[in-house]
Protein backbone atom coordinates (compact mmCIF):
# COMPACT_ATOMS: atom_id res chain seq x y z
CA UNK A 1 0.00 0.00 0.00
CA UNK A 2 1.24 3.45 -0.86
CA UNK A 3 -0.06 6.61 0.75
CA UNK A 4 0.62 10.06 -0.69
CA UNK A 5 1.43 12.46 2.09
CA UNK A 6 0.01 15.43 0.27
CA UNK A 7 -3.26 13.65 -0.27
CA UNK A 8 -4.12 13.20 3.37
CA UNK A 9 -5.21 16.78 3.81
CA UNK A 10 -3.51 17.62 7.11
CA UNK A 11 -2.26 20.63 5.19
CA UNK A 12 -5.75 22.00 4.90
CA UNK A 13 -5.30 25.13 6.97
CA UNK A 14 -8.94 25.92 7.57
CA UNK A 15 -10.72 22.77 8.62
CA UNK A 16 -13.57 24.92 9.93
CA UNK A 17 -15.56 24.53 6.77
CA UNK A 18 -18.37 22.61 5.28
CA UNK A 19 -17.82 19.49 3.23
CA UNK A 20 -21.37 18.72 2.25
CA UNK A 21 -23.33 21.12 0.12
CA UNK A 22 -25.87 20.18 -2.41
CA UNK A 23 -26.02 18.25 -5.63
CA UNK A 24 -23.42 19.45 -8.08
CA UNK A 25 -25.66 19.78 -11.09
CA UNK A 26 -24.76 23.39 -11.89
CA UNK A 27 -22.85 26.31 -10.53
CA UNK A 28 -25.55 28.94 -10.33
CA UNK A 29 -25.39 31.33 -7.40
CA UNK A 30 -28.20 33.21 -5.75
CA UNK A 31 -27.84 35.75 -8.51
CA UNK A 32 -28.58 33.05 -11.07
CA UNK A 33 -32.16 34.16 -11.82
CA UNK A 34 -30.81 37.33 -13.44
CA UNK A 35 -28.11 35.43 -15.30
CA UNK A 36 -29.78 32.31 -16.57
CA UNK A 37 -33.46 33.07 -16.65
CA UNK A 38 -35.74 33.05 -13.66
CA UNK A 39 -38.37 30.72 -15.07
CA UNK A 40 -35.82 28.29 -16.48
CA UNK A 41 -34.32 27.93 -13.01
CA UNK A 42 -37.76 27.62 -11.48
CA UNK A 43 -38.58 24.76 -13.84
CA UNK A 44 -35.19 23.18 -13.15
CA UNK A 45 -35.86 23.44 -9.44
CA UNK A 46 -39.17 21.65 -9.83
CA UNK A 47 -37.34 18.82 -11.56
CA UNK A 48 -34.46 18.44 -9.11
CA UNK A 49 -35.22 20.06 -5.76
CA UNK A 50 -38.69 18.65 -5.20
CA UNK A 51 -38.33 15.12 -6.54
CA UNK A 52 -38.11 13.48 -3.11
CA UNK A 53 -40.90 15.39 -1.39
CA UNK A 54 -42.95 15.22 -4.58
CA UNK A 55 -43.18 11.43 -4.47
CA UNK A 56 -44.24 11.30 -0.81
CA UNK A 57 -47.99 11.21 -1.67
CA UNK A 58 -47.38 7.66 -2.94
CA UNK A 59 -47.12 6.38 0.64
CA UNK A 60 -47.14 9.11 3.33
CA UNK A 61 -50.90 9.53 3.85
CA UNK A 62 -51.52 5.78 3.59
CA UNK A 63 -48.90 4.92 6.19
CA UNK A 64 -50.01 7.64 8.61
CA UNK A 65 -53.71 6.74 8.54
CA UNK A 66 -53.13 2.98 8.51
CA UNK A 67 -50.74 3.25 11.44
CA UNK A 68 -53.15 5.37 13.46
CA UNK A 69 -56.14 3.14 12.68
CA UNK A 70 -54.28 -0.02 13.67
CA UNK A 71 -56.26 -2.23 11.30
CA UNK A 72 -59.66 -0.75 12.20
CA UNK A 73 -61.68 1.44 9.82
CA UNK A 74 -60.38 5.00 9.74
CA UNK A 75 -62.73 7.41 11.50
CA UNK A 76 -63.46 10.94 10.30
CA UNK A 77 -61.66 12.45 13.29
CA UNK A 78 -58.61 10.30 12.58
CA UNK A 79 -58.45 11.22 8.87
CA UNK A 80 -58.91 14.92 9.59
CA UNK A 81 -56.28 14.75 12.32
CA UNK A 82 -53.71 13.15 10.03
CA UNK A 83 -54.45 15.61 7.22
CA UNK A 84 -54.10 18.52 9.61
CA UNK A 85 -50.76 17.16 10.83
CA UNK A 86 -49.50 16.80 7.24
CA UNK A 87 -50.65 20.31 6.34
CA UNK A 88 -49.03 22.00 9.32
CA UNK A 89 -45.88 19.91 9.06
CA UNK A 90 -45.43 21.15 5.50
CA UNK A 91 -46.15 24.73 6.55
CA UNK A 92 -43.93 24.78 9.64
CA UNK A 93 -41.02 22.48 8.79
CA UNK A 94 -40.65 23.11 5.07
CA UNK A 95 -42.22 26.51 4.43
CA UNK A 96 -41.40 28.48 7.58
CA UNK A 97 -38.06 26.93 8.46
CA UNK A 98 -36.46 26.24 5.11
CA UNK A 99 -38.24 28.36 2.49
CA UNK A 100 -38.67 31.56 4.50
CA UNK A 101 -35.77 31.38 6.97
CA UNK A 102 -32.80 29.18 6.11
CA UNK A 103 -32.80 29.97 2.39
CA UNK A 104 -31.52 33.38 3.49
CA UNK A 105 -28.52 31.81 5.23
CA UNK A 106 -26.30 31.20 2.20
CA UNK A 107 -22.55 30.62 2.19
CA UNK A 108 -21.40 32.58 -0.86
CA UNK A 109 -24.57 31.46 -2.62
CA UNK A 110 -24.45 27.84 -1.44
CA UNK A 111 -26.76 26.08 0.99
CA UNK A 112 -26.86 22.75 2.78
CA UNK A 113 -26.11 21.41 6.22
CA UNK A 114 -22.36 21.73 5.90
CA UNK A 115 -22.49 25.18 4.37
CA UNK A 116 -24.57 26.16 7.38
CA UNK A 117 -21.93 24.60 9.61
CA UNK A 118 -19.24 26.65 7.90
CA UNK A 119 -21.23 29.83 8.46
CA UNK A 120 -21.69 28.97 12.12
CA UNK A 121 -18.02 28.23 12.71
CA UNK A 122 -17.03 31.40 10.90
CA UNK A 123 -19.48 33.41 12.99
CA UNK A 124 -18.05 32.00 16.22
CA UNK A 125 -14.59 33.07 15.11
CA UNK A 126 -12.99 29.84 16.24
CA UNK A 127 -12.94 26.16 15.43
CA UNK A 128 -16.05 24.79 17.06
CA UNK A 129 -15.78 21.05 17.62
CA UNK A 130 -19.48 20.96 18.49
CA UNK A 131 -20.51 22.37 15.11
CA UNK A 132 -18.03 20.11 13.32
CA UNK A 133 -19.56 17.07 15.01
CA UNK A 134 -23.03 18.27 14.04
CA UNK A 135 -21.88 18.64 10.44
CA UNK A 136 -20.44 15.13 10.38
CA UNK A 137 -23.68 13.76 11.83
CA UNK A 138 -25.72 15.57 9.17
CA UNK A 139 -23.50 14.30 6.36
CA UNK A 140 -23.49 10.76 7.72
CA UNK A 141 -27.28 10.70 7.95
CA UNK A 142 -27.50 11.88 4.36
CA UNK A 143 -25.61 8.77 3.26
CA UNK A 144 -28.15 6.61 5.10
CA UNK A 145 -30.98 8.50 3.44
CA UNK A 146 -29.28 8.12 0.04
CA UNK A 147 -29.87 4.38 0.22
CA UNK A 148 -33.43 4.43 1.52
CA UNK A 149 -34.87 7.08 -0.80
CA UNK A 150 -34.32 5.18 -4.08
CA UNK A 151 -35.53 1.94 -2.50
CA UNK A 152 -38.81 3.23 -1.06
CA UNK A 153 -39.55 5.62 -3.92
CA UNK A 154 -39.19 3.14 -6.78
CA UNK A 155 -40.79 0.31 -4.78
CA UNK A 156 -43.86 2.40 -3.90
CA UNK A 157 -44.30 3.45 -7.53
CA UNK A 158 -44.11 -0.06 -8.98
CA UNK A 159 -46.54 -1.31 -6.34
CA UNK A 160 -49.18 0.29 -8.53
CA UNK A 161 -49.00 -2.93 -10.55
CA UNK A 162 -50.82 -4.70 -7.71
CA UNK A 163 -53.77 -2.39 -8.32
CA UNK A 164 -53.66 -2.54 -12.12
CA UNK A 165 -53.13 -6.30 -12.30
CA UNK A 166 -53.12 -8.22 -8.99
CA UNK A 167 -51.61 -11.23 -10.76
CA UNK A 168 -48.41 -9.20 -11.24
CA UNK A 169 -47.88 -8.70 -7.50
CA UNK A 170 -45.01 -11.20 -7.45
CA UNK A 171 -43.16 -9.13 -10.06
CA UNK A 172 -43.06 -5.93 -7.98
CA UNK A 173 -39.77 -6.68 -6.22
CA UNK A 174 -37.98 -8.08 -9.32
CA UNK A 175 -39.07 -5.09 -11.39
CA UNK A 176 -37.95 -2.73 -8.63
CA UNK A 177 -34.56 -4.41 -8.59
CA UNK A 178 -34.35 -4.16 -12.38
CA UNK A 179 -35.19 -0.44 -12.40
CA UNK A 180 -32.66 0.27 -9.65
CA UNK A 181 -29.90 -1.73 -11.35
CA UNK A 182 -30.54 0.16 -14.59
CA UNK A 183 -30.61 3.49 -12.72
CA UNK A 184 -27.26 2.90 -11.04
CA UNK A 185 -25.86 1.28 -14.16
CA UNK A 186 -26.27 4.39 -16.31
CA UNK A 187 -24.55 6.68 -13.79
CA UNK A 188 -21.18 6.22 -15.47
CA UNK A 189 -22.60 7.74 -18.67
CA UNK A 190 -23.76 10.91 -16.93
CA UNK A 191 -27.20 12.46 -16.78
CA UNK A 192 -26.70 15.62 -18.82
CA UNK A 193 -28.95 14.45 -21.66
CA UNK A 194 -31.86 13.15 -19.59
CA UNK A 195 -31.58 15.86 -16.92
CA UNK A 196 -33.09 18.41 -19.28
CA UNK A 197 -36.35 16.44 -19.12
CA UNK A 198 -36.50 16.35 -15.31
CA UNK A 199 -38.24 19.71 -15.05
CA UNK A 200 -40.99 19.05 -17.62
CA UNK A 201 -41.62 15.52 -16.29
CA UNK A 202 -41.97 16.71 -12.70
CA UNK A 203 -44.10 19.63 -13.86
CA UNK A 204 -46.54 17.13 -15.36
CA UNK A 205 -46.26 14.99 -12.22
CA UNK A 206 -47.24 17.81 -9.86
CA UNK A 207 -50.03 18.92 -12.20
CA UNK A 208 -51.30 15.32 -12.15
CA UNK A 209 -51.17 15.26 -8.34
CA UNK A 210 -53.24 18.43 -8.18
CA UNK A 211 -55.77 17.19 -10.74
CA UNK A 212 -56.22 13.86 -8.94
CA UNK A 213 -56.74 15.57 -5.61
CA UNK A 214 -59.12 18.20 -6.95
CA UNK A 215 -61.38 15.54 -8.44
CA UNK A 216 -61.74 13.72 -5.13
CA UNK A 217 -62.01 16.62 -2.72
CA UNK A 218 -65.54 16.93 -4.03
CA UNK A 219 -66.22 13.40 -2.73
CA UNK A 220 -66.34 14.94 0.74
CA UNK A 221 -65.65 18.71 0.80
CA UNK A 222 -65.84 18.69 4.60
CA UNK A 223 -62.31 17.32 4.51
CA UNK A 224 -61.16 20.94 4.16
CA UNK A 225 -61.95 21.39 7.84
CA UNK A 226 -58.54 19.82 8.49
CA UNK A 227 -57.01 23.20 7.66
CA UNK A 228 -57.87 24.07 11.26
CA UNK A 229 -54.81 23.14 13.42
CA UNK A 230 -57.23 22.17 16.20
CA UNK A 231 -57.69 18.78 14.53
CA UNK A 232 -53.93 18.13 14.64
CA UNK A 233 -53.67 19.17 18.28
CA UNK A 234 -56.72 17.14 19.27
CA UNK A 235 -55.39 14.06 17.50
CA UNK A 236 -52.04 14.19 19.31
CA UNK A 237 -53.68 14.93 22.66
CA UNK A 238 -56.20 12.10 22.43
CA UNK A 239 -54.06 9.33 20.93
CA UNK A 240 -51.06 9.26 23.28
CA UNK A 241 -48.31 6.94 22.08
CA UNK A 242 -50.26 6.09 18.93
CA UNK A 243 -50.28 9.79 18.12
CA UNK A 244 -46.50 9.94 18.41
CA UNK A 245 -46.11 6.85 16.23
CA UNK A 246 -48.43 8.42 13.67
CA UNK A 247 -46.30 11.56 13.77
CA UNK A 248 -43.39 9.44 12.56
CA UNK A 249 -45.46 8.41 9.54
CA UNK A 250 -46.65 11.98 8.96
CA UNK A 251 -43.00 12.99 8.74
CA UNK A 252 -42.80 11.02 5.49
CA UNK A 253 -44.70 13.91 3.92
CA UNK A 254 -41.85 16.35 4.60
CA UNK A 255 -38.86 14.13 3.77
CA UNK A 256 -36.97 15.88 1.03
CA UNK A 257 -37.76 19.29 2.47
CA UNK A 258 -34.12 19.72 3.44
CA UNK A 259 -33.26 19.58 -0.27
CA UNK A 260 -34.73 23.06 -0.71
CA UNK A 261 -31.83 24.47 1.28
CA UNK A 262 -29.24 22.02 -0.01
CA UNK A 263 -29.89 23.07 -3.61
CA UNK A 264 -29.82 26.80 -2.93
CA UNK A 265 -26.60 27.29 -4.89
CA UNK A 266 -27.92 25.54 -7.97
CA UNK A 267 -31.17 27.38 -8.52
CA UNK A 268 -31.23 30.44 -6.28
CA UNK A 269 -33.53 31.47 -3.47
CA UNK A 270 -36.27 33.15 -5.50
CA UNK A 271 -36.83 30.30 -8.01
CA UNK A 272 -37.02 27.74 -5.18
CA UNK A 273 -39.42 29.90 -3.16
CA UNK A 274 -41.57 30.59 -6.21
CA UNK A 275 -41.73 26.93 -7.24
CA UNK A 276 -42.62 25.80 -3.71
CA UNK A 277 -45.16 28.45 -2.75
CA UNK A 278 -46.73 28.86 -6.16
CA UNK A 279 -46.89 25.31 -7.47
CA UNK A 280 -45.40 22.40 -5.53
CA UNK A 281 -46.95 23.05 -2.11
CA UNK A 282 -50.48 23.63 -3.48
CA UNK A 283 -50.23 20.48 -5.63
CA UNK A 284 -49.13 18.36 -2.67
CA UNK A 285 -51.82 19.69 -0.34
CA UNK A 286 -54.58 19.24 -2.92
CA UNK A 287 -53.49 15.65 -3.48
CA UNK A 288 -53.30 14.83 0.24
CA UNK A 289 -56.74 16.33 0.86
CA UNK A 290 -58.08 14.44 -2.14
CA UNK A 291 -56.78 11.18 -0.67
CA UNK A 292 -58.42 12.09 2.63
CA UNK A 293 -61.77 12.78 0.99
CA UNK A 294 -61.54 9.49 -0.93
CA UNK A 295 -60.91 7.49 2.25
CA UNK A 296 -63.79 9.24 4.04
CA UNK A 297 -66.17 8.38 1.21
CA UNK A 298 -64.71 4.91 0.57
CA UNK A 299 -62.82 3.44 3.58
CA UNK A 300 -61.69 0.45 1.49
CA UNK A 301 -59.52 2.81 -0.56
CA UNK A 302 -57.09 3.01 2.36
CA UNK A 303 -55.35 -0.07 0.91
CA UNK A 304 -53.64 2.29 -1.53
CA UNK A 305 -55.47 5.63 -1.70
CA UNK A 306 -53.05 7.16 -4.19
CA UNK A 307 -53.71 4.65 -6.96
CA UNK A 308 -57.38 4.31 -6.00
CA UNK A 309 -57.84 7.96 -6.98
CA UNK A 310 -57.83 7.11 -10.70
CA UNK A 311 -59.99 4.74 -12.75
CA UNK A 312 -58.60 1.23 -13.11
CA UNK A 313 -57.73 1.85 -16.75
CA UNK A 314 -55.41 4.70 -15.76
CA UNK A 315 -53.56 2.87 -12.99
CA UNK A 316 -50.90 1.45 -15.33
CA UNK A 317 -50.13 4.83 -17.00
CA UNK A 318 -50.05 6.42 -13.55
CA UNK A 319 -47.66 3.69 -12.39
CA UNK A 320 -45.33 4.45 -15.28
CA UNK A 321 -45.49 8.17 -14.53
CA UNK A 322 -44.87 7.53 -10.83
CA UNK A 323 -41.91 5.32 -11.68
CA UNK A 324 -40.43 8.10 -13.81
CA UNK A 325 -40.93 10.59 -10.96
CA UNK A 326 -39.31 8.28 -8.41
CA UNK A 327 -36.38 7.61 -10.72
CA UNK A 328 -35.86 11.37 -10.99
CA UNK A 329 -36.08 11.71 -7.20
CA UNK A 330 -33.61 8.86 -6.79
CA UNK A 331 -31.24 10.37 -9.35
CA UNK A 332 -31.17 13.62 -7.41
CA UNK A 333 -30.26 11.75 -4.22
CA UNK A 334 -27.55 9.70 -5.95
CA UNK A 335 -26.02 12.84 -7.44
CA UNK A 336 -26.15 14.43 -4.02
CA UNK A 337 -24.28 11.49 -2.52
CA UNK A 338 -21.56 11.81 -5.17
CA UNK A 339 -21.24 15.50 -4.39
CA UNK A 340 -21.12 14.90 -0.64
CA UNK A 341 -18.36 12.30 -0.89
CA UNK A 342 -16.38 14.44 -3.32
CA UNK A 343 -16.50 17.41 -0.96
CA UNK A 344 -15.61 15.22 2.03
CA UNK A 345 -12.53 14.06 0.12
CA UNK A 346 -11.65 17.61 -0.82
CA UNK A 347 -11.74 18.58 2.86
CA UNK A 348 -9.67 15.67 4.06
CA UNK A 349 -12.48 13.87 5.84
CA UNK A 350 -12.28 10.81 3.60
CA UNK A 351 -9.59 9.20 1.45
CA UNK A 352 -9.56 10.02 -2.24
CA UNK A 353 -12.14 8.14 -4.26
CA UNK A 354 -11.83 7.77 -7.99
CA UNK A 355 -13.74 10.61 -9.64
CA UNK A 356 -14.85 10.46 -13.27
CA UNK A 357 -16.27 13.48 -15.04
CA UNK A 358 -19.35 12.78 -17.11
CA UNK A 359 -19.65 16.19 -18.75
CA UNK A 360 -17.12 18.16 -20.79
CA UNK A 361 -18.78 21.46 -19.92
CA UNK A 362 -19.92 21.01 -16.31
CA UNK A 363 -17.25 19.92 -13.83
CA UNK A 364 -19.95 19.37 -11.23
CA UNK A 365 -21.34 16.33 -13.03
CA UNK A 366 -19.25 13.54 -11.55
CA UNK A 367 -19.37 9.80 -11.12
CA UNK A 368 -17.71 7.89 -8.27
CA UNK A 369 -17.57 4.17 -9.19
CA UNK A 370 -16.98 2.82 -5.69
CA UNK A 371 -19.62 4.99 -4.09
CA UNK A 372 -22.08 4.05 -6.83
CA UNK A 373 -21.43 0.34 -6.23
CA UNK A 374 -21.82 0.67 -2.45
CA UNK A 375 -25.06 2.62 -2.83
CA UNK A 376 -26.47 0.03 -5.25
CA UNK A 377 -25.61 -2.83 -2.89
CA UNK A 378 -27.23 -1.01 0.02
CA UNK A 379 -30.37 -0.13 -1.94
CA UNK A 380 -30.84 -3.67 -3.26
CA UNK A 381 -30.37 -5.14 0.22
CA UNK A 382 -33.08 -2.82 1.54
CA UNK A 383 -35.53 -3.82 -1.20
CA UNK A 384 -34.87 -7.53 -0.73
CA UNK A 385 -34.99 -7.26 3.06
CA UNK A 386 -38.18 -5.20 3.44
CA UNK A 387 -40.05 -6.31 0.25
CA UNK A 388 -42.79 -3.62 0.50
CA UNK A 389 -42.85 0.17 0.80
CA UNK A 390 -45.00 -0.12 3.94
CA UNK A 391 -42.28 -2.07 5.74
CA UNK A 392 -39.57 0.18 4.37
CA UNK A 393 -41.46 3.25 5.57
CA UNK A 394 -40.54 2.24 9.11
CA UNK A 395 -36.89 2.75 8.24
CA UNK A 396 -37.48 6.05 6.50
CA UNK A 397 -37.45 9.39 8.25
CA UNK A 398 -34.93 9.04 11.07
CA UNK A 399 -32.02 10.20 8.91
CA UNK A 400 -33.88 13.23 7.54
CA UNK A 401 -35.26 14.22 10.95
CA UNK A 402 -31.73 14.09 12.36
CA UNK A 403 -30.50 16.38 9.60
CA UNK A 404 -33.35 18.80 10.24
CA UNK A 405 -32.55 19.00 13.96
CA UNK A 406 -28.91 19.66 13.06
CA UNK A 407 -29.95 22.40 10.62
CA UNK A 408 -32.09 24.04 13.28
CA UNK A 409 -29.33 24.11 15.90
CA UNK A 410 -26.76 25.50 13.50
CA UNK A 411 -29.33 27.95 12.15
CA UNK A 412 -29.62 29.39 15.66
CA UNK A 413 -25.86 30.01 15.76
CA UNK A 414 -25.96 31.77 12.38
CA UNK A 415 -28.95 33.95 13.29
CA UNK A 416 -27.45 34.83 16.66
CA UNK A 417 -23.81 35.36 15.80
CA UNK A 418 -23.65 36.08 12.07
CA UNK A 419 -26.89 38.02 11.67
CA UNK A 420 -26.22 39.63 15.07
CA UNK A 421 -29.67 39.10 16.52
CA UNK A 422 -29.95 39.08 20.29
CA UNK A 423 -29.97 35.51 21.56
CA UNK A 424 -33.54 35.82 22.96
CA UNK A 425 -34.78 37.00 19.55
CA UNK A 426 -32.90 34.23 17.74
CA UNK A 427 -34.24 31.65 20.19
CA UNK A 428 -37.78 32.98 19.81
CA UNK A 429 -37.61 32.41 16.06
CA UNK A 430 -35.70 29.14 15.83
CA UNK A 431 -36.51 27.33 19.09
CA UNK A 432 -40.16 26.51 18.19
CA UNK A 433 -38.96 25.12 14.84
CA UNK A 434 -36.26 23.02 16.51
CA UNK A 435 -38.83 21.70 19.00
CA UNK A 436 -41.05 20.59 16.11
CA UNK A 437 -38.04 18.89 14.48
CA UNK A 438 -37.16 17.24 17.79
CA UNK A 439 -40.72 15.99 18.13
CA UNK A 440 -40.52 14.35 14.71
CA UNK A 441 -37.10 12.93 15.60
CA UNK A 442 -38.54 11.40 18.78
CA UNK A 443 -41.45 9.96 16.82
CA UNK A 444 -39.07 8.33 14.35
CA UNK A 445 -37.01 6.85 17.19
CA UNK A 446 -40.08 4.81 18.14
CA UNK A 447 -39.60 2.95 14.85
CA UNK A 448 -36.07 1.95 15.82
CA UNK A 449 -36.74 -1.78 16.10
CA UNK A 450 -39.05 -1.78 13.06
CA UNK A 451 -36.34 -0.64 10.69
CA UNK A 452 -35.20 2.84 11.71
CA UNK A 453 -31.95 1.22 12.84
CA UNK A 454 -30.97 0.78 9.19
CA UNK A 455 -30.18 4.42 8.30
CA UNK A 456 -28.71 4.92 11.77
CA UNK A 457 -26.39 1.98 11.13
CA UNK A 458 -25.36 3.38 7.75
CA UNK A 459 -24.85 6.82 9.27
CA UNK A 460 -22.87 5.41 12.19
CA UNK A 461 -20.61 3.49 9.82
CA UNK A 462 -19.99 6.67 7.82
CA UNK A 463 -19.21 8.65 10.98
CA UNK A 464 -16.75 5.98 12.18
CA UNK A 465 -14.96 6.09 8.83
CA UNK A 466 -14.68 9.90 8.96
CA UNK A 467 -13.50 9.84 12.58
CA UNK A 468 -10.94 7.11 11.85
CA UNK A 469 -9.58 8.90 8.81
CA UNK A 470 -9.20 12.25 10.59
CA UNK A 471 -7.58 10.63 13.63
CA UNK A 472 -5.22 8.53 11.53
CA UNK A 473 -4.13 11.50 9.43
CA UNK A 474 -3.54 13.59 12.56
CA UNK A 475 -1.39 10.86 14.15
CA UNK A 476 0.50 10.42 10.89
CA UNK A 477 1.28 14.13 10.82
CA UNK A 478 2.49 14.11 14.42
CA UNK A 479 4.79 11.20 13.65
CA UNK A 480 6.09 12.85 10.50
CA UNK A 481 6.67 16.18 12.24
CA UNK A 482 9.20 14.61 14.61
CA UNK A 483 11.56 13.93 11.71
CA UNK A 484 10.96 17.14 9.75
CA UNK A 485 13.59 19.80 9.07
CA UNK A 486 12.73 23.52 8.99
CA UNK A 487 12.89 24.81 5.42
CA UNK A 488 14.92 27.90 6.37
CA UNK A 489 17.61 25.69 7.94
CA UNK A 490 17.92 23.61 4.77
CA UNK A 491 18.11 26.69 2.53
CA UNK A 492 20.88 28.13 4.70
CA UNK A 493 22.78 24.86 4.57
CA UNK A 494 22.44 24.59 0.78
CA UNK A 495 23.72 28.12 0.31
CA UNK A 496 26.86 27.23 2.26
CA UNK A 497 27.33 23.83 0.63
CA UNK A 498 25.51 23.91 -2.73
CA UNK A 499 24.85 20.56 -4.46
CA UNK A 500 24.91 19.97 -8.20
CA UNK A 501 22.35 22.25 -9.90
CA UNK A 502 20.19 20.92 -12.76
CA UNK A 503 18.00 22.88 -15.13
CA UNK A 504 14.24 23.12 -14.78
CA UNK A 505 11.68 23.60 -12.04
CA UNK A 506 10.81 21.15 -9.28
CA UNK A 507 7.45 21.42 -7.51
CA UNK A 508 7.26 19.64 -4.17
CA UNK A 509 3.74 18.98 -2.87
CA UNK A 510 3.76 19.07 0.90
CA UNK A 511 1.66 19.45 4.01
CA UNK A 512 3.42 22.40 5.61
CA UNK A 513 5.52 24.92 3.73
CA UNK A 514 7.54 25.72 6.86
CA UNK A 515 9.23 22.31 6.75
CA UNK A 516 11.23 20.49 4.09
CA UNK A 517 9.08 18.13 2.00
CA UNK A 518 10.22 14.49 2.37
CA UNK A 519 10.53 14.24 -1.42
CA UNK A 520 13.05 17.10 -1.43
CA UNK A 521 15.15 15.42 1.26
CA UNK A 522 15.07 12.14 -0.68
CA UNK A 523 16.08 13.92 -3.87
CA UNK A 524 19.07 15.54 -2.18
CA UNK A 525 20.05 12.37 -0.34
CA UNK A 526 19.85 9.90 -3.21
CA UNK A 527 20.24 12.02 -6.37
CA UNK A 528 22.44 14.71 -4.80
CA UNK A 529 20.99 17.39 -7.10
CA UNK A 530 18.94 20.56 -6.78
CA UNK A 531 16.86 22.20 -9.51
CA UNK A 532 17.33 25.78 -10.65
CA UNK A 533 13.91 26.66 -9.30
CA UNK A 534 12.24 24.82 -6.42
CA UNK A 535 8.62 25.45 -5.46
CA UNK A 536 7.21 24.32 -2.12
CA UNK A 537 3.52 23.83 -2.93
CA UNK A 538 0.70 23.59 -0.41
CA UNK A 539 -2.98 23.30 -1.20
CA UNK A 540 -5.61 24.86 1.03
CA UNK A 541 -9.33 24.11 1.01
CA UNK A 542 -11.29 27.13 2.15
CA UNK A 543 -14.58 27.34 4.05
CA UNK A 544 -16.26 28.90 1.02
CA UNK A 545 -17.75 26.90 -1.87
CA UNK A 546 -15.50 28.52 -4.48
CA UNK A 547 -12.46 30.77 -4.66
CA UNK A 548 -12.13 33.62 -7.14
CA UNK A 549 -9.23 33.47 -9.59
CA UNK A 550 -7.69 36.56 -7.99
CA UNK A 551 -7.47 34.73 -4.65
CA UNK A 552 -6.45 31.36 -6.06
CA UNK A 553 -2.68 31.60 -5.63
CA UNK A 554 -0.16 33.12 -3.25
CA UNK A 555 3.54 33.21 -4.15
CA UNK A 556 6.39 34.13 -1.81
CA UNK A 557 10.00 34.25 -2.97
CA UNK A 558 12.11 32.71 -0.18
CA UNK A 559 15.54 32.74 -1.84
CA UNK A 560 17.12 32.73 -5.27
CA UNK A 561 16.25 29.08 -5.79
CA UNK A 562 13.23 28.58 -3.52
CA UNK A 563 9.65 29.86 -3.60
CA UNK A 564 6.53 29.02 -1.63
CA UNK A 565 3.23 28.70 -3.47
CA UNK A 566 -0.16 28.17 -1.84
CA UNK A 567 -3.15 27.21 -3.97
CA UNK A 568 -6.64 27.79 -2.61
CA UNK A 569 -9.75 25.89 -3.64
CA UNK A 570 -13.32 26.06 -2.41
CA UNK A 571 -14.86 22.98 -0.84
CA UNK A 572 -17.11 22.49 -3.88
CA UNK A 573 -14.32 22.84 -6.44
CA UNK A 574 -12.28 20.15 -8.14
CA UNK A 575 -8.57 20.90 -7.67
CA UNK A 576 -6.62 21.24 -10.91
CA UNK A 577 -3.03 22.06 -9.93
CA UNK A 578 -1.49 22.70 -13.40
CA UNK A 579 -4.36 24.98 -14.41
CA UNK A 580 -4.11 26.92 -11.15
CA UNK A 581 -0.34 27.31 -11.45
CA UNK A 582 -0.78 29.09 -14.77
CA UNK A 583 -2.06 32.02 -12.69
CA UNK A 584 1.43 32.32 -11.20
CA UNK A 585 2.58 33.99 -14.40
CA UNK A 586 0.86 37.15 -13.22
CA UNK A 587 3.01 36.99 -10.08
CA UNK A 588 6.30 36.70 -11.93
CA UNK A 589 6.76 32.93 -12.19
CA UNK A 590 6.72 31.80 -15.81
CA UNK A 591 5.22 28.39 -15.17
CA UNK A 592 5.88 25.90 -17.98
CA UNK A 593 4.49 22.41 -17.50
CA UNK A 594 7.04 20.89 -19.91
CA UNK A 595 10.03 22.08 -17.88
CA UNK A 596 8.46 21.30 -14.50
CA UNK A 597 8.66 18.09 -12.49
CA UNK A 598 6.22 17.40 -9.66
CA UNK A 599 7.63 15.49 -6.69
CA UNK A 600 5.06 13.66 -4.59
CA UNK A 601 5.87 12.03 -1.25
CA UNK A 602 4.18 8.70 -0.74
CA UNK A 603 4.02 6.64 2.42
CA UNK A 604 3.43 2.91 2.68
CA UNK A 605 1.56 2.31 5.93
CA UNK A 606 1.76 -0.71 8.20
CA UNK A 607 -0.02 -1.21 11.54
CA UNK A 608 2.40 -0.76 14.44
CA UNK A 609 2.67 -3.29 17.23
CA UNK A 610 1.46 -0.57 19.57
CA UNK A 611 -0.62 2.32 18.28
CA UNK A 612 -2.46 5.28 19.76
CA UNK A 613 -5.55 4.01 17.93
CA UNK A 614 -7.44 0.84 18.67
CA UNK A 615 -6.23 -2.16 16.70
CA UNK A 616 -9.40 -2.34 14.61
CA UNK A 617 -9.22 1.39 13.93
CA UNK A 618 -5.60 1.16 12.83
CA UNK A 619 -6.47 -1.63 10.40
CA UNK A 620 -9.42 0.39 9.11
CA UNK A 621 -7.23 3.44 8.56
CA UNK A 622 -4.61 1.42 6.67
CA UNK A 623 -7.36 -0.17 4.56
CA UNK A 624 -8.83 3.26 3.79
CA UNK A 625 -5.38 4.52 2.82
CA UNK A 626 -4.89 1.54 0.51
CA UNK A 627 -8.18 2.34 -1.20
CA UNK A 628 -7.20 5.96 -1.81
CA UNK A 629 -6.99 7.04 -5.41
CA UNK A 630 -3.69 8.30 -6.77
CA UNK A 631 -2.83 11.91 -5.83
CA UNK A 632 -1.56 12.55 -9.35
CA UNK A 633 -4.97 11.83 -10.82
CA UNK A 634 -6.82 13.66 -8.07
CA UNK A 635 -4.87 16.90 -8.64
CA UNK A 636 -5.01 16.36 -12.42
CA UNK A 637 -1.22 16.45 -12.81
CA UNK A 638 0.15 14.89 -16.03
CA UNK A 639 1.63 11.53 -15.04
CA UNK A 640 4.64 12.10 -17.27
CA UNK A 641 5.69 15.06 -15.13
CA UNK A 642 5.46 13.27 -11.75
CA UNK A 643 8.25 11.77 -9.63
CA UNK A 644 7.04 9.72 -6.67
CA UNK A 645 9.22 9.13 -3.63
CA UNK A 646 8.06 6.49 -1.16
CA UNK A 647 8.80 5.47 2.41
CA UNK A 648 7.35 2.88 4.77
CA UNK A 649 5.73 4.17 7.95
CA UNK A 650 4.17 2.31 10.87
CA UNK A 651 1.16 3.80 12.61
UniProtKB/Swiss-Prot annotation:
The entry's localization annotation reads:
Cell inner membrane
Q: Name one GO cellular component term.
A: plasma membrane
Q: Which reaction does it catalyse?
A: K(+)(in) + H(+)(in) = K(+)(out) + H(+)(out)
Annotated membrane topology is: Multi-pass membrane protein
Q: Does the keyword Transcription apply?
A: no
Task: Please name the GO terms that the record assigns under molecular function.
Answer: potassium ion transmembrane transporter activity; symporter activity
Q: Does the keyword Transmembrane helix apply?
A: yes
Protein keywords: Cell inner membrane, Cell membrane, Ion transport, Membrane, Potassium, Potassium transport, Symport, Transmembrane, Transmembrane helix, Transport
Pfam families reported in the protein's UniProt record: K_trans, K_trans_C
* Record-annotated membrane-spanning stretches: 38-58, 77-97, 129-149, 166-186, 197-217, 242-262, 276-296, 314-334, 366-386, 396-416, 421-441, 448-468
| Protein origin, superkingdom | Bacteria
Question: What does the function comment of this entry state?
Answer: Transport of potassium into the cell. Likely operates as a K(+):H(+) symporter.
The similarity comment for this entry is: Belongs to the HAK/KUP transporter (TC 2.A.72) family.
Q: What is this protein called?
A: Probable potassium transport system protein Kup 3
- What lineage is on file? Bacteria, Pseudomonadati, Pseudomonadota, Alphaproteobacteria, Hyphomicrobiales
